[in-house]
């Protein structure tokens, strides 16, 4: 499988990679900034959720060159009765020391490219509102709140 690649700040090649026995430990060690912890689950929890939903969850690691810088998990479930869970981003964890370098944007764009490849017309993301929420980040990328909420989280959608 090949995934979108991009260059950010010089010659660093960004890529997504599957989680394997060789990188799962490092993936579980990724941590966001302390003020972000209430907004995103740890990678280990995300991987446990992915394990329980094979064929739906799409967990990937974000690399800048050989450095593991983040984790993203999407979901592709076209038959889901809840429309905003049919195609979307479930998690985005960029390690604290690697934020504000374009890696999160790359990860989201890579998920959207995968969604397009799968024939999806839109994708969603949910976030917990609050002072340090990822809302401004997702709005800058083109996601728009739908007016819906799920368990207190804002539902936003982007057309592909």
Predicted segments with their positions:
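Short, Lys/Arg-enriched N-terminal segments with co-localized hydrophobic residues
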Residues: 1-10
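Short beta-strand-to-coil "C-cap" segments at the C-terminal boundary of structured domains/repeats
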Residues: 157-160
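Active-site acidic-Proline motif in GNAT/NAT acetyltransferases
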Residues: 95-97, 101, 130
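Conserved GNAT acetyl-CoA-binding A-motif
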Residues: 115-127
